[in-house]
Each structure stands twice: as C-alpha cells, then as structure tokens.
Curated annotation (Swiss-Prot):
Organism per entry: Coxiella burnetii (strain RSA 331 / Henzerling II)
The name this protein goes by in its record: Alanine racemase
GO biological process: D-alanine biosynthetic process
Catalyses which reaction(s): L-alanine = D-alanine
SUPFAM superfamilies in the cross-refs: Alanine racemase C-terminal domain-like, PLP-binding barrel
Chain sites annotated for binding substrate: 129, 307
Gene Ontology molecular function: alanine racemase activity; pyridoxal phosphate binding
Primary enzyme class: isomerase
Function: Catalyzes the interconversion of L-alanine and D-alanine. May also act on other amino acids.
Length: 364
C-alpha cells in the first residue's frame, strides 16, 4: 500500500499516435521513445506504438534493448556511433545512425561493415548543439554519397531550437535555412519535433518526430494558448502518478508542517500525509500550494516535500480517509501544471520517476 504508482494507459498511447498520423497524413511518424520512453518504460512504449513507422532513441544501449525483446521496426539512434565496435553493432542489428560530426564520417570510411547502414545527415540550422553547419553540409553530403557503407538515399534532418516560442522569427529562419541547403540534395527530410508539429505545418515533410505529445502532454507547457484546445481535445495523458494517504492528522492553528517549519496552519485544520516524495521522483522544489487531486477535488500541498512523504491540506476534503488515492499528475491534473509550479518542465518530471515507483499498465 505504501508504494507510489505510475499507471500507464497504453490505449491512450496508441490513441495519441493515431491522432498524430491523422493530423499529418502525408508524413511518416518517427516516434521518440528515448530516456526510457520519456519515463513511461522503453519496451512498454515501443510495444504499444507498433504502428509507428520508426523509433528514435538517444543511444545504442536503448536500441539494443529494443532489439533484444524482438522489436523489428526501424530504430534511429540520435547520437549515432562513437567507435568501430559500436558501428559494427549498428550494422549487425540494422540500426539507423544520425551522422553529426566528422569523426563519424571518418569511422564510416575506414570500417568494413557486414551490411550497409541507414544514416541521417544532421544539419545544424541554429540549435548549435550537434550537426554540421549549413556551410559544411553540402560537402559532407557529397562525401557520404560516395560511401559503399551507406544506404541511399541519405536522410536529411535538423532540429528546431525554439519551436515552442510564440515568437516564430528564429524557427522560421531555421526552416528557411534547411530548405535552402537541402534544395539540391536527394533524400527523405525531417524537421519537426512535437512543438514544430503543431506550429509549423510548412515543415511537415517526409518524416515527423513526435516526442512529448505522444504521451499526451503539451510541448508548449501551460502558457502557449494557440494549440491548447486542440491538444486537450485530441490527446490523452498516458501516465497518472498516484499515491495513498497513510495518515490523517488534526493540527492546531500555528502548528508548522514539515522540514524547516516553512508552512504553518492558519487555523485548526486536518492534514493528510501522502506516501510519495522526492525519493520517488516527485519534485522537491514543488512549493506549498501545488495542487494534488483527491476524490475529484483539488487539495494544496503544504510544507516541504520530503524524501518519502508530502503533506496536503484536507480542509476541502473532510471525509478523506487513510487509503484514499491522491493523484499527483495525470488524468484530471495535467503534469504541465505541476511542472509550472515547480519551476521546471514536464519532460523532467516524467524522466525522474524512480525505480521504487510501481508501474501498472491499463487499457482504458
């Protein structure tokens, strides 16, 4: 009873992918499932998203895990390979590689592979993280074209740095740069992430790379209203994080609650202790007033988040009982709201769920 639970609705996951495909019928979906499926479980998510045209992961270990459990779909590794041993694994397990630096090109040229490799040339149009500059990219593309180790055509991709910003100036510049540099290149193209998927229909090219939206979460947080109604109407949250009330206490006016005595009762009042804390991945920096959902009603967090427990104000829930479920985020309480309160992003909260949280799959 004491363990927090992350309930993963695989039906919602499948539904979200179907919505993405319906909104971009001319594009293929490259489902991003890196970082343990955004905290939802790598293998679980891959099996649920069998209708995706390909999967995107961050590193070779994630890709090999999928192959080991029998996932046969195309897998593209976003950071590519870094030595000959890894490169051989790419060929052996039919993994696609993102090529983003000259060291990788050199490795391809000097390594004898058992089979040719599917690759994507990453063009840095302004993210300034990985990829070849706009000026370098044509020469690298021509160099890759001559390699017998590479399948043709070569994929062409970029990554948008600011697609979730209502000011579109920089993203439009990135898209313009990409179309310009790839104009004479032959190969499938990929530009958009989840935010770009909604905000830049002109960039819905051959492949789209949905990530956070697959899990029913807005890439815009709670402050960007242009797509709020569409996202809430068409997409469903996949993860619901919950924990149980393990104690109810009646506290007196001026009693402090929790470490540091940072919060005090304004009157005599009931409080509940809930079996979740930062040791489970709930954000320690969530302030008093952060909402939780109890029996369909909002209750505020009070005091500091502890490693194993939080306290909540029960004044709106006088009939609450030990054993009642408290929803920390998910169905009925968007994780974007909790992220905003905690001064972070939903991605971080999802990826920080720890191993002691029990995961349950449902189809609903």
């Amino acid at each position: 009873m004491n363990r927090a639970t992350a309930t993963i609705n695989v039906t919602a996951l499948k539904h979200n992918l179907s919505q993405i495909k319906a909104l971009a019928p001319k594009s293929l979906a490259w489902a991003m499932i890196k970082s343990n499926g955004y905290g939802h479980g790598l293998v679980r998510v891959a099996k649920a998203l069998s209708d995706a045209n390909a999967f995107g992961v961050a590193c070779i270990d994630e890709a090999l895990t999928l192959r080991e459990v029998g996932i046969k779909s195309p897998i593209i590794v976003m950071k590519g390979f870094y030595n000959e041993a890894e490169l051989s694994q790419f060929a052996r397990h039919r993994l696609g590689a993102v090529i983003h630096c000259s060291d990788q090109v050199s490795l391809l040229e000097k390594t004898n592979l058992t089979s040719s490799l599917s690759v994507w040339l990453k063009i840095d149009t302004g993210m300034n993280r990985l990829g070849f500059s706009v000026e370098q990219s044509p020469a690298v593309y021509n160099q890759l074209k001559t390699s017998s180790s590479i399948q043709k055509p070569i994929g062409l991709m970029t990554h948008l740095a600011d697609a979730d910003n209502e000011n579109k100036t920089f993203t439009e510049l990135q898209i313009k740069r990409f179309f310009s540099v790839t104009e004479k290149m032959i190969g499938p193209k990929s530009i958009v992430n989840s935010a770009g998927f909604f905000a830049y229909p002109n960039a819905l090219v051959d492949w789209i790379r949905p990530g956070i939206i697959l899990y029913g979460i807005s890439p815009f947080g709670i402050n960007y209203n242009s797509f709020k109604e569409k996202i809430e109407k068409k997409f469903r949250p996949v993860m619901t994080l919950s924990a149980k009330i393990i104690a109810i206490k009646n506290r007196r006016q001026n009693d402090s609650v929790g470490y540091g005595c940072t919060w005090s009762c304004s009157e005599d009042m009931p409080i509940a202790i809930v079996s979740i804390g930062y040791g489970d991945g709930y954000p320690r920096h969530a302030p008093s007033g952060t909402p939780v959902l109890l029996n369909g009603k909002i209750c505020p967090l009070i005091g500091r988040v502890s490693m194993d427990m939080i306290a909540i104000d029960l004044r709106s829930q006088p009939n609450a009982q030990v054993g009642d479920d408290v929803i920390l985020w998910g169905e009925g309480l968007p994780v974007e709201i909790i992220a905003e309160k905690a001064g972070t992003i939903a991605y971080e909260l999802l990826c920080k769920i720890t191993q002691r949280v029990q995961f349950i799959e449902i189809e609903k």
